[in-house]
Amino acid sequence: MASNNVAQFAAELKMPAGVLLEQLQAAGVTKASEDDSLSETDKARLLDHLRKSHGSTDADKRKITLTKRHTSEIKQSDATGKARTIQVEVRKKRTFVRRDETSAENGDASNHVAEAEVDDLELQRREEEARHEAELLEKQAQELKARQEQLEREEAERQAREAAAEVERRRAEEEAAKKRAAAAAEAAAREQQTQASKPAQAAQPAAAKAEPVAAKAAEPVVARQSEQDDERAAAERAAQREAAKKAEDAARQAAEKARAEQEEIAKRRAAAEAEARAIREMMNTPRKAQVKAPEPAPKPAEPAKAAEAKGTLHKPARPAGEAPARPAAKKPAAAAPAATTTPSAGDKKKPGGGKGGWQDDAAKRRGIKTRGDTSGGVDRGWRGGPKGRGKHQDQNTTFQAPTEPIVREVHVPETITVADLAHKMAVKASEVIKSMMKLGQMVTINQMLDQETAMIIVEELGHHAVAAKLDDPEAMLVEGEVSDAESLPRPPVVTVMGHVDHGKTSLLDYIRRAKVAAGEAGGITQHIGAYHVETPRGVITFLDTPGHEAFTAMRARGAKATDIVILVVAADDGVMPQTKEAIAHAKAGGVPLVVAINKIDKPDANPERVKQELVAEGVVPEEYGGDSPFVSVSAKTGAGIDDLLENVLLQAEVLELKAPVEAPAKGLVIEAKLDKGKGPVATILVQSGTLNRGDVVLAGSAYGRVRAMLDETGKPTKSAGPSIPVEIQGLSEVPQAGEEVIVMPDERKAREVALFRQGKFRDVKLAKQQAAKLENMLEQMGEGEVQYMPLIVKADVQGSQEALVQSLLKLSTDEVRVQIVHGAVGGISESDVNLATASKAVIIGFNTRADAQARKLAEANGVDIRYYNIIYDAVDDVKAAMSGMLAPEKREVVTGTVEVRQVFKVPKIGAVAGCMVTDGFVKRSSSVRVLRNNVVIFTGELDSLKRFKDDVKEVRQGFECGMSIKNFNDIVEGDQFEVFEVTEVARSL
């Protein structure tokens, strides 16, 4: 905004108006008050006065003096040995000299060597001023454009008005000319009539003269009229030309003025941009700069050379006569290449007689310190000499910072540390940590991130994330799967599935002619068993799975390893939940079903109802047009067993089951356990190839050489072919049930893959735990008070431990939660007892026992150890213990109703109600609700209960009493008191 008075100008200069008035008075500008107007001439006079008074010269315009102050601390001990901190202040004064361009061109000026050190704040201020000036120039350009458009519109309107006035004037002149012509014609006619009415004496001569007279009288009128028309047309044309010329001149002047203003604005904008560019370059260059003083040089002939000799602020001018290479006198061998050096290559050399400019010095300081000279010049350091001549070339190139961000394709593995992720993106680790903090996670530089989180961070930082292929040794396992061995028919693997207590194991007992079911705890199967049976029709391998709901994972593993599923359904019980689950497992695996309707020997057996229920579940018998054979059997009498086996073998023939025999074995871990004498033991179902004793096997993260191999009867065996279950010993640890078993060529390769899998499992587990920390924290904040029941679960086999842990975790509620501190396979050891002591946990042993040392330690520390053989009992006991941890439920029981008959006001006590107990009884310790018009207005406790003048504990129905209520005196006759007691009721899950 332009300053029109002294006050506004003082506000622009950010100085008091009184000081400005004094300066104006000193400059000879008389202003009495702050409201006096101020012209541009007054400002110019003030500026000249200030320049003269402060001694401003042209030299000051070319010289800038900057002062920098730096404060530091040093610690020094005095004579007594006491340390003191001393403040040290260093003041640096640097002068920046701009060389005169004209004198540089003429070669008669030389600038002194100066050091320029520009403060960062000063540079930012300059850049801000340049940007502000550019914005002002842009705003002025817009205002000028708008003003020019307005002037053009006004000029067009004015020309339109002038043209309309000219047309109106012409029309008026034409009408006046017509009137004058008509008047002249009338006058001529009257004159002719007058001459015709004269005496007839001169008839002949007059008649002879009449025509000439009339012609003479008419000729001047016509001539005058034509002359007037010509003059009028000429005047109109002249006026038109004059108006057009004026309009053209006005338009040309306006265009020239606008062009001049635009050129001025463009020049100012270019100057502002150049200044901003110079400031940015100064900010990007090193702080200390030495400007080389140029030597006098003759005026160059070519413009390009003139521009080169002129020099800039950042690069001193090189004299035209000086060669860009080193002097030939000192380096003859380098003279020839220097002579043929192109100007572009010469520009890279140092512009001085053997000593580089400030840019080269800064580049040397930034670069890596080497023992040899890489500058290609004279100064070769201590290695310089004839032997090292010409070996090094100039390799100091100025690094150009990329102007656009580089988008990288980052391959993210399954787990990666923060430091590695930052290295892949070529950013600092602090940037990655900052992005993680924005996402709500606190991480360290060595923390593992899972793949999903890492890919989110990569995308947040503007790069492209790609899930990397695992660089693991398992890829070689897949490559070596191709085998040239001949595939031969193999026995079918049949899994027996169904609901608990439907007779699965009893059916297998009859087929095996063994008594397995009688030896199982509680009469239910809690392990997955594998048996192969030789029948007259061929060999069949059976897998017996548990039917209890807790063993879902076991049933899923059984369906995965099987070829045919026998679905056992009790004829007297029908389709149950685990029956439906077994059907779902079989359908998910694409395994054919053979339905065995068991217990047909019972009186209440109803096979038809079972068929209808199975049809509703999608299992249609063959007699109804389906593809599932239904066989009615009895595991007790053996009825229908032969038909069942025949249907199973028929299904196997249809499937044409084959597997290579002479090949390395591959299989599946059916069950695994930790035996105290044998170590880790795994039950394996061989699916292809032949497993021999002494082979090196890999099962998940466990590996080892097969030291012993037993069949399902416990007898040693040397080899096992396809579809044969065996029990092997010699693994490094207990493998997870369901893992794939592969025979490896050597133990070194097996160890490498196993260790890789262990590390990957650990990294993935840690990364997932870290990702879930924040969610768990927020969840716990919203939970409030939650009770935890810590448990340590030890089981005989892996599958049972897994099933028991899952069943116990399902008991958790919002108030009480099961916390599995540790779960493993094997007996209860001292380390388990120590862990239970530290975590205050209860140890649950499922088909396992504690050794003597563990029992003594548990008794000494008061650790509770519970033994179970049936999964029902373990789940029920934990459920009962959790019920005891629940907070009791509070219930209100109404004991009586009281009616207020009269109210007494007792000093220092308040209102006392004379009441009649109309229902139930009233106790001194009861709580009471005050009802008025059947609306509760107060709930509180009794303060006193009296009968006559005696305090009583209880008043029953039909008796009168006096009552007062704590903190309530607003008692009115007719109120009712509802007396109640609060009782606590134990809750259960």
Curated annotation (Swiss-Prot):
Alphabetical list of Gene3D superfamilies matching this protein: P-loop containing nucleotide triphosphate hydrolases, Putative DNA-binding domain, N-terminal subdomain of bacterial translation initiation factor IF2, Translation factors, Translation initiation factor IF- 2, domain 3
Positions of the UniProt region annotated as G3:
544-547
Pfam families linked to this entry:
EF-G_D2, GTP_EFTU, IF-2, IF2_assoc, IF2_N
- Annotated region (G4) at 598-601
- Report residues binding GTP: 498-505, 544-548, 598-601
Biased amino acid composition, Basic and acidic residues: 40-60, 122-178, 231-280
Task: Write out the ranges of the annotated region (G2).
Answer: 523-527
Ranges where the record places region G5: 634-636
Q: What is its main location?
A: cytoplasm
In residue numbers, the region (Disordered) covers 28-60, 97-397
Which keywords does this chain's UniProt record carry? Cytoplasm, GTP-binding, Initiation factor, Nucleotide-binding, Protein biosynthesis
Q: What is this protein called?
A: Translation initiation factor IF-2
Per the UniProt entry, what species is this protein from, by scientific name?
Paraburkholderia xenovorans (strain LB400)
